[in-house]
Swiss-Prot record:
Keyword Transmembrane helix: no
SUPFAM superfamilies linked to this entry: Concanavalin A-like lectins/glucanases
Name of this chain's protein: Ran-binding protein M homolog
Cellular localization per UniProt: Cytoplasm; Nucleus; Cytoplasm, Perinuclear region
CTLH domain location: 295-353
UniProtKB keywords: Cytoplasm, Nucleus
PROSITE patterns per the UniProt record, alphabetical: B302_SPRY, CTLH, LISH
Amino acid sequence: MNSSPPPANSANGDTTNNGENGQDLNLNFLDKIRLSAKRDAKEDEGEELPTELNTINSAGGFLVVSPDKLSVKYTNTNLHGHDVGVVQANKPAPIKCLTYYFEIFVKDSGIKGQIAIGFTKESFKMRRQPGWEVNSCGYHGDDGYLYRGQGKGEPFGPKFTKDDAVGGGINYASQEFFFTKNGTIVGKIPKDIRGHLFPTVAVHSQNEEVLVNFGKKKFAFDIKGYEASERNKQQLAIEKISIPPNIGYGLVKTYLLHYGYEETLDAFNLATKNTVPPIHIDQENAIDEDDSSYALKQRKNLRQLVRNGEIDTALAELQKLYPQIVQDDKSVVCFLLHCQKFIELVRVGKLEEGVNYGRLELAKFVGLTGFQDIVEDCFALLAYEKPEESSVWYFLEDSQRELVADAVNAAILSTNPNKKDVQRSCHLQSHLEKLLRQLTVCCLERRSLNGDQGETFRLRHVLNNNR
């Protein structure tokens, strides 16, 4: 096992002239900084939810919507089949979620009880019951039938009338519509309508009146419990997949090796000593532990220095052990280390020293393609009395130190003389991370096949939901 660095003048260790792969390796970390700036904004980016009824786009001649826009009453006389009072929500159902659900409460079933609940497209004809037209579906109270895209319904569930709470929902995971009555699911059907759908309510005979609940009040149906059950189904399906213990062991081990977490690796090996079958993971899955173990102690020590904010010491160690990494003072690794040194000075309030350091080391990157925006963001730290509360707060997070440590780690791994230039970009991620990236792509592809509807895969959310 080769865990020592190559000679300082090793041609194979030159990270400054590795062609496109070396350049991609370096630029990857600059892109990660830019993503840090957008990370929380993207994760918190929500959708507008339906909150009330749309009084502009409705069959206004046959119904009256209350001032709070949460109840509707049929006030006309039903003389024709198309004298329907239809009203949609003010916004379409959200699509970046596991489920969507809303309810109505039948305050008065009127003369005929021809109340309906369902989903329609924005272009739906507002004098037709939901389900009578294409691209719509509706559960009707007078016969308990489900209508979807035509005037003829199909047996579906019980009728509903005065004092009943009836709900309509979309399960994006199973691609189904489902409907409830008084807190119990009465049926579900395949969701064969693409695009944005609006929660829709219809009344069709004199004095029919319903109250609409978009979630401001407690639902009769336990939607949170339903979602938990759906997630549990997904988890059980995953757990049925049999994976040999040594596969998971190998992935975790090479992850720890890749990032130089030597002490954690020792503890992990000790904890799994008597539980993992003695099968050599390399032969089974082509995971090369020798490559991941390369310069392990050096990488561990340098990571710790960066994580502690000891940038001067880290630079000195790199100069001593891997001068080829820092010989170009305008390389990405040097840039990241100098940025981090500047950040550490700002962190402890040494602003004047930070200004001087910035003029000496960061000014050389001003105007260089790929660096300018990050330099400006770094300098912006000086403009705030409390930079940790500013728009560039992420520079002061521990994750920023980890990112710089990862860049140094990858640069050292790329000096491995046993690796060809074309293989060096593989040091950007461990095998475990590559697997998770593939999983993310597969989940995105599945979501694309469902019309870009449903939850997007976020590992952090998955882990939190399965604790």
